[in-house]
């Protein structure tokens, strides 16, 4: 059974393997053992209540409960920008007009922004290519909503997610090449590494301080503003179906979109509910896939089951109960994995 659980120190080797498969551009999952070890330690200190809100971050892994193999990672930052500034570009408009000359130009413009300061962030989502089947990607992404629903007081009103922008297999980013490189005087991979290892002071020191007309960028760079990496496109669709929207904020490095949603409007959070669990053989039937998660903060588990999403009593096998770290009589959180398609 594939389950989501909190990260552990022993996961470092598996996370190094995952980091080596990202293809670059995933700033929060670099193949750097010291950085990953520090990330794990920060997550464990978050669970133990040792960190202030601005440093808190949860990390989860997707594990095969029978073999112990790890095939994916996902994370939540509790409140971004409280320690280090959180930068985006806001894609806005400046109008230049002259009645005398009968000229009116509305120009797309990039404005440096800290508007998402204090928001909770979904981040570090990566699934091993060999595991991209059987709903694993949905489980990995949406399990975080089950954790947020169970422990709502730990998170803020707005949730954001930075989507990886367009970068080729050689690490070439059209947006960075046309804009960032002119100010930072380094390749995208170098800037990405510095940011991923926590060396972020250079951003504030070297960022352009004034609005930038997108017409001054190359056509190639303009074309990728707000667009996602091909491997990230499915993740974007998943979040949009949960209620997330692109509100014209983009990443300062690769131009990828930032999606956002009020936490209480996220479908899986809003529609999830607690049901009693019982041991037995689940009833046969054409039931949809559902997310199920325990309510145990320190030993959180989430998995997929086939069930009636409206049931008040969820029947699970002994193996499923064991994998979810719960017993008959406990209450678990249940929600349909995907929103029902509207029919006319």
From Swiss-Prot:
Summary of the function given for this chain in its UniProt record: Catalyzes the transfer of succinyl-CoA to arginine to produce N(2)-succinylarginine.
Catalysed conversion reaction: succinyl-CoA + L-arginine = N(2)-succinyl-L-arginine + CoA + H(+)
Active site positions: 229 (proton donor)
Keyword tags: Acyltransferase, Arginine metabolism, Transferase
Superkingdom, taxonomy of origin: Bacteria
Pathway: Amino-acid degradation; L-arginine degradation via AST pathway; L-glutamate and succinate from L-arginine: step 1/5
GO biological process, one term: arginine catabolic process to glutamate
Pfam families per UniProt: AstA
A GO molecular-function descriptor: arginine N-succinyltransferase activity
Family statement drawn from the similarity comment of this UniProt entry: Belongs to the arginine N-succinyltransferase family.
Organism lineage: Bacteria, Pseudomonadati, Pseudomonadota, Gammaproteobacteria, Enterobacterales
Xref: PANTHER family: ARGININE N-SUCCINYLTRANSFERASE (PTHR30420:SF1), N-SUCCINYLARGININE DIHYDROLASE (PTHR30420)
Record-listed E.C. numbers: 2.3.1.109
Residues involved in succinyl-CoA binding: 125
The protein's name: Arginine N-succinyltransferase
Gene designation per UniProt: astA
């Amino acid at each position: 059974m594939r389950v989501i659980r909190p990260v552990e120190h022993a996961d470092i080797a598996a996370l190094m393997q995952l980091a080596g498969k990202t293809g670059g551009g995933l700033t929060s999952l670099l193949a750097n053992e010291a950085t990953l070890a520090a990330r794990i330690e920060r997550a464990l200190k978050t669970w133990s209540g040792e960190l202030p809100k601005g440093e808190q971050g949860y990390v989860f892994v997707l594990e095969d409960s029978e073999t112990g193999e790890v095939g994916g990672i996902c994370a939540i930052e509790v409140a971004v920008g409280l320690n280090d500034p959180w930068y985006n570009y806001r894609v806005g408009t400046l109008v230049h007009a002259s009645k005398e000359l009968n000229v009116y130009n509305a120009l797309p413009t990039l404005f440096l922004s800290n508007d998402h300061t204090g928001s909770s962030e979904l981040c570090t989502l990566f699934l091993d290519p060999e595991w991209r089947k059987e709903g694993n990607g949905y489980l990995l992404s949406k399990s975080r909503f089950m954790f947020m629903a169970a422990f709502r007081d730990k998170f803020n009103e707005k949730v954001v997610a930075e989507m990886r922008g367009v970068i080729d297999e050689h690490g070439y980013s059209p947006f960075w090449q046309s804009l960032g490189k002119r100010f930072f005087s380094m390749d995208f991979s170098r800037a990405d590494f510095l940011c991923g290892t926590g060396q972020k002071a250079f951003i504030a020191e070297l960022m352009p301080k004034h609005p930038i007309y997108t017409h001054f960028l190359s056509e190639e760079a303009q074309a990728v503003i707000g667009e996602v990496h091909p491997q990230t496109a499915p993740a974007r669709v998943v979040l949009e179906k949960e209620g997330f929207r692109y509100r014209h904020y983009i990443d300062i490095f690769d131009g990828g979109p930032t999606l956002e949603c009020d936490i209480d409007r996220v479908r899986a959070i809003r529609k999830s509910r607690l049901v009693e669990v019982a041991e037995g053989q689940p009833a046969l039937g054409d039931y949809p896939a559902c997310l199920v998660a325990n309510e145990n903060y320190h030993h959180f588990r989430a998995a997929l089951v086939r069930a009636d999403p409206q049931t008040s009593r969820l029947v699970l096998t002994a193996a499923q109960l064991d994998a979810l770290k719960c017993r008959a009589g406990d209450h678990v959180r249940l929600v349909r994995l995907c929103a029902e398609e509207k029919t006319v």
